[in-house]
């Protein structure tokens, strides 16, 4: 019985009809309402956390691009240790620069000295194989960042899809119980089935109240993730192009 209080608080703040419907629900209906309520808590937690993360990522991405484009050499921020870790672009940049350093070090150059001496061009030149290696590192990192941004989005998609069906299940179950009681009592009076039907319909209402915010939040977050994914792809191409211009082959 105590577990029912998980759903009592929000329902008690609603009008008397919703509270009455919950009270007259079957145990299965109450259980479904409680499950939906708990799912709603997790859904809102994921949406709020994810939205804050996306806002910070967008802001840090803007700052990172401004700082990167102000420098004369593509590896300047890497050398200066100017980190923008909240931006999904920064890991791409960091690992690409690290790969560049590995390639140049394999040619007998000290990466730090080489970068500092290459602000206005480099005496070292990179061939297509070396550029492709750096590009592959950048693209793999971009894929990893895309997966990180999409983490927990599956839960929101599941909530959007499953909540209405779970509510519908509760409604069908409740209506079935209501008609069973009508047969048991041997009466077709509306007063005999109305309480059970009211409780049954409550699960659909709660299911929709969970699904609608989930759907809106999912679409908003998907739009931001799509925008950042495009930013990552564009930056990856820009970075490789800048590296080619500074270390172009003879």
Predicted regions and their residues:
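Short, strongly hydrophobic alpha-helical membrane anchors
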Residues: 1-25, 187-189
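Transmembrane alpha-helix/interfacial motif
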Residues: 25-73, 77-79
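Hydrophobic alpha-helical transmembrane segments and adjacent short intramembrane/lumenal linkers
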Residues: 186-200
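Hydrophobic alpha-helical transmembrane segments of polytopic membrane proteins
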Residues: 199-214
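Predominantly long cytosolic amphipathic alpha-helical stalk/bundle segments
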Residues: 59-165, 175-189, 214-250
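Lipid-exposed faces of alpha-helical membrane segments in multi-pass integral membrane proteins
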Residues: 31-48, 159, 163-169, 206, ...
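Residue-level signature of catalytic and energy-coupling elements of molecular machines
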Residues: 26, 44, 77, 93, ...
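Juxtamembrane loop-transmembrane helix junctions in multi-pass integral membrane proteins
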Residues: 14-30, 148-154, 158-161
């Amino acid at each position: 019985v105590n577990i029912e209080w998980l759903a009592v608080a929000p329902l008690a703040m609603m009008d008397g009809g919703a509270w009455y419907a919950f009270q007259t629900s079957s145990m299965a209906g109450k259980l479904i309402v409680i499950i939906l309520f708990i799912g709603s808590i997790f859904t809102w937690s994921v949406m709020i956390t994810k939205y804050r993360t996306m806002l910070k990522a967008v802001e840090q991405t803007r700052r990172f691009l401004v700082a990167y484009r102000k420098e004369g050499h593509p590896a300047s921020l890497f050398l200066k240790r100017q980190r923008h870790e909240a931006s999904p672009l920064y890991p791409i940049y960091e690992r690409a620069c690290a790969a560049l350093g590995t390639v140049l070090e394999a040619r007998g150059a000290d990466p730090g000295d080489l970068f500092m001496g290459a602000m206005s061009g480099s005496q070292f030149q990179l061939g297509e194989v070396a550029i492709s290696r750096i590009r592959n590192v950048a693209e793999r990192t971009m894929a990893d960042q895309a997966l990180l941004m999409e983490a927990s989005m599956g839960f929101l998609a599941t909530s959007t899809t499953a909540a209405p069906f779970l509510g519908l299940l509760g409604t069908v179950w409740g209506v079935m119980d209501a008609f069973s009681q009508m047969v048991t009592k041997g009466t077709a009076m509306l007063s005999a089935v109305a309480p059970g039907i009211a409780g049954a319909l409550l699960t659909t209402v709660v299911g929709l109240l969970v699904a609608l915010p989930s759907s809106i939040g999912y679409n908003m977050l998907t739009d931001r993730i799509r925008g950042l994914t495009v930013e990552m792809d564009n930056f990856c191409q820009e970075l490789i192009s800048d590296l080619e211009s500074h270390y172009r082959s003879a």
